[in-house]
């Protein structure tokens, strides 16, 4: 409504809010723009046999996640194949209940990763990063402590992370503040999602 009436909203455009609100689409965009993504399904997984084959390929444990999810809702960790069908069904039901869409996707589950976020500000001609925050101390997928700078990143990894994040945000024409989230383990970072606001 604001855009239709030429009123400037302080924040991301409706196009980018929609684009990054769908986590499957966000992963595709990140990959197309040079960010590493977590091994898993290319899109939403509907068929249980297809899902099981994928899990065998990437290996357990896996994480089933709601495409429109957030806050740990519609997200299930599967440690063994025998539990997959039940947890797959539960994740889809939760996704529909909380987000009105039962689409889920599957990713390799990292046992002890760091959760790193990069905040950005972007305008028509320039995107800048506001450095990183380490948000690894969590309870029920909710951050308890934010630490900056992250004690686990060295200068080379930090530089690479910032450059790739800024490049992706610039390429999609994003305007406003945003938070790009990553999983970091064993010296490698992987795109997780982008929030179209400064995440707190």
Where are these regions (language model features)?
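N-terminal beta-alpha lobe that positions the nucleotide/phosphoryl donor
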Residues: 1-180, 184-200
């Amino acid at each position: 409504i604001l855009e239709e009436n030429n009123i400037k909203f302080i924040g991301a455009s409706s196009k980018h809010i929609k684009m990054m609100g769908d986590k499957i689409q966000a992963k595709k965009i990140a990959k197309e723009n040079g960010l590493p993504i977590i091994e898993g399904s290319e899109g939403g997984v509907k068929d249980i046999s297809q899902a099981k084959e994928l899990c065998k390929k990437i290996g357990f444990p896996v994480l089933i996640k709601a495409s429109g999810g957030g806050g740990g809702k519609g997200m299930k960790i599967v440690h063994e194949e025998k539990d997959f069908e039940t947890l797959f069904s539960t994740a889809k039901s939760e996704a529909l209940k909380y987000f009105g869409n039962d689409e889920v996707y599957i990713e390799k589950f990292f046992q002890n990763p760091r959760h790193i976020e990069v905040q950005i500000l972007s305008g028509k001609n320039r995107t800048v990063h506001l450095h990183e925050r380490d948000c690894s101390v969590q309870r029920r997928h909710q951050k308890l402590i934010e630490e900056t700078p992250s004690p686990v990143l060295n200068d080379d990894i930090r530089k690479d992370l910032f450059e790739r994040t800024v490049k992706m945000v610039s390429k999609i024409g994003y305007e406003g503040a945003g938070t790009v989230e990553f999983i970091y383990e064993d010296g490698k970072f992987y795109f997780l999602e982008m929030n179209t606001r400064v995440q707190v």
